[in-house]
């Protein structure tokens, strides 16, 4: 992604098409052709379309869950394969961002030194631990959802987690650097975009919930989305204070943190209603 994220001049295409295709081009391994002009207009369109990437991942998750269900694969192995698929689909870039941010925050260093650690390509103990904990939490929660006959909720985790990425880049945040990916996207996301996506995902999930499990669970996805946004907002304020701004690693960390939070919340909610 970083290799495609340097500001260039040129003309823009239609906003919707450019945003969706470029989001998929930058933030997934899918062979989709994106924009050829890179600036803050491009960045804003990509961030507005960010949950589309999660929706695509969610559809692929549904296909994988259906296939593994037919084959009789255990919930634990199913969860492992689902989380691996998510990471492969995004080239593990959000995992890398989580590791970098954890190393920098875990250093408790002054902002200047913390930014140097954030830019260091090597992963330390804090970064490794954060990655391990996040993956373990997601695998365990997804396994619980599959075992609890709530696999449909798993399909919404990728899209909901990207609301956290949007919050990390909301209007009011300052890019850590005047160049690169963060400079194009940080501070571009309007809160009504996030709200619109939350409503859209909530309505869609409500329809699926009524079909798959009954009306009693329609509240889970909207609540999970709100919690993801609150957690990401808290994290965004913290990294802004510690680093003096936000970059692409912070957005990736926000997505990964939100995925873990959403997965746990959904698993606990389902367990509480069925236990």
Swiss-Prot record:
Keyword terms: Cell membrane, Cobalamin biosynthesis, Magnesium, Membrane, Transferase, Transmembrane, Transmembrane helix
Gene Ontology CC annotation, any one: plasma membrane
Location within or outside the cell: Cell membrane
Bilayer topology annotation: Multi-pass membrane protein
Pfam family, one: CobS
Pathway: Cofactor biosynthesis; adenosylcobalamin biosynthesis; adenosylcobalamin from cob(II)yrinate a,c-diamide: step 7/7
Keyword presence, S-adenosyl-L-methionine: no
Catalysed conversion reaction: alpha-ribazole + adenosylcob(III)inamide-GDP = adenosylcob(III)alamin + GMP + H(+); alpha-ribazole 5'-phosphate + adenosylcob(III)inamide-GDP = adenosylcob(III)alamin 5'-phosphate + GMP + H(+)
Swiss-Prot/TrEMBL cofactor(s): Mg(2+)
One GO BP: cobalamin biosynthetic process
InterPro entries per record: CobS
EC supergroup of this enzyme: transferase
Domain of life: Bacteria
Transmembrane segments: 52-72, 73-93, 126-146, 181-201, 208-228, 251-271
Keyword Ion transport: no
One Gene Ontology term of the molecular function aspect: adenosylcobinamide-GDP ribazoletransferase activity
Record EC number: 2.7.8.26
HAMAP family the record matches: CobS
Entry-linked PANTHER family: ADENOSYLCOBINAMIDE-GDP RIBAZOLETRANSFERASE
Function description: Joins adenosylcobinamide-GDP and alpha-ribazole to generate adenosylcobalamin (Ado-cobalamin). Also synthesizes adenosylcobalamin 5'-phosphate from adenosylcobinamide-GDP and alpha-ribazole 5'-phosphate.
Family membership noted in the UniProt record: Belongs to the CobS family.
NCBIfam families: PRK00235.2-4
Protein's recorded name: Adenosylcobinamide-GDP ribazoletransferase
Organism this protein belongs to: Corynebacterium efficiens (strain DSM 44549 / YS-314 / AJ 12310 / JCM 11189 / NBRC 100395)
Gene this chain is encoded by: cobS
């Amino acid at each position: 992604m970083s290799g495609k994220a340097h500001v260039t001049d040129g003309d823009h295409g239609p906003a919707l098409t450019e945003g969706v295709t470029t989001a998929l081009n930058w933030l997934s391994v899918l062979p989709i052709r994106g924009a050829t002009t890179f600036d803050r207009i491009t960045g804003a369109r990509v961030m507005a379309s960010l949950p589309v990437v999660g929706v695509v991942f969610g559809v692929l998750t549904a296909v994988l869950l259906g296939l593994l269900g037919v084959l009789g694969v255990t919930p634990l192995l199913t969860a492992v394969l689902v989380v691996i698929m998510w990471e492969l689909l995004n080239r593990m870039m959000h995992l890398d961002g989580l590791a970098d941010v954890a190393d920098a925050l875990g250093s408790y260093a002054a902002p200047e030194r913390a930014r140097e650690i954030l830019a260091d390509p090597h992963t330390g103990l804090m970064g490794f631990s954060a990655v391990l904990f996040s993956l373990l939490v997601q695998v365990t929660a997804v396994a619980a959802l599959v075992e609890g006959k709530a696999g449909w909720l798993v399909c919404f985790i990728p899209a909901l987690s990207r609301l956290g990425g949007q919050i990390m880049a909301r209007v009011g945040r300052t890019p850590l650097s005047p160049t690169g990916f963060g400079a194009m996207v940080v501070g571009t996301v309007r809160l009504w975009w996030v709200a619109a996506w939350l409503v859209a995902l909530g309505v869609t999930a409500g329809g699926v919930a009524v079909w798959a499990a009954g009306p009693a669970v329609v509240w889970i996805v909207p609540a999970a989305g709100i919690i993801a946004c609150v957690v990401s907002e808290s994290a965004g304020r913290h990294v802004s204070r510690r680093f003096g701004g936000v970059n692409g690693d912070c957005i990736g960390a926000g997505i990964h943190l939100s995925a873990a939070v959403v997965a746990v919340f959904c698993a606990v909610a389902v367990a509480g209603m069925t236990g």
